[in-house]
Amino acid sequence: MAFLWIHVPISRIWYSNLRKCYIKMLYISYKFTIMKEVLIIMWIADGWKEYEVIDTSKGEKLERWGDYLLVRPDPQVIWDTPRKNRGWKHMNGHYHRSSRGGGEWEFFDLPHQWELHYKDLTFNLKPFSFKHTGLFPEQAVNWDWFGEKIRNAGRPIKVLNLFAYTGGATLAAAAAGASVTHVDASKGMVNWAKENAAASGLSGAPIRWLVDDCVKFVEREIRRGNHYDAIIMDPPSYGRGPKGEIWKIEDAIHPLIKLCTKILSDDPLFFLVNSYTTGLAPAVLTYMLATELKPWKGSVESQEIGLPVTESGLVLPCGASGRWCSSR
């Protein structure tokens, strides 16, 4: 297996036993994973040292989170490959999906909480409902991307992080030198993000922590006349607000992107949208960002994001990201 960085002008990419595919962008940088007759084009979060997807099989993935092994369900894993790795029989935690919906954890010598590090960032992990641990490791590929943009901007950058969860993107942006407004509707998630900031040595960083409805917050920022140089959003596929409001990403994502353009500064740096909904293909993210950010000079690229799988040497898809970046 080989990893290649390829900078491609307008052209066709050809590979044996694969159909030709057109790339309709002026210039694109992609990471290619090539294994014999397999060509995978996606953004891969392969900078982890303490996290690893060891294997995938029968609707589940075997992961290493620091010193501990977890088995969790994954809807992308539709293949039934042999489970040869001994970790399948020696896990520290196993999330069992219920036929009635949801599920529950089964633990084997797993602490209530432990730490995981990515470069200079530290995250507090603790398994909780809906199979989660408090971190989405695949997002590291985006942290690296916008962290470099912020560090090379040569000016102060003001970032808005919507649906900010436990703060992975917030901490990555703050560590790169940005001032960040972190917004999430869950008080528990915001407090967890604050704990991660403290563990990462970023307690004194210019981060504004807000428990709020993201759409309503943006609407108020428009009325206040506040603006941001960069926007990050990681909306859920489905959600319900405290007053019964229903969020469906297919219906709400485009209006929210459009709304957010009203709080962009005159010289925005980037706009990042993440999606874990299979119906929102990368091309859909590209279309929305390209149309709504047309007044600003920039380029758009979208792609699946993924995590390398040790046993197979392939990549587990983990959603998609759309990136708009200033061309100035």
Model segments located where?
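Non-catalytic substrate-recognition/targeting regions of SAM-dependent transferases
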Residues: 48-64, 70-137, 144
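S-adenosyl-L-methionine
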Residues: 190-230
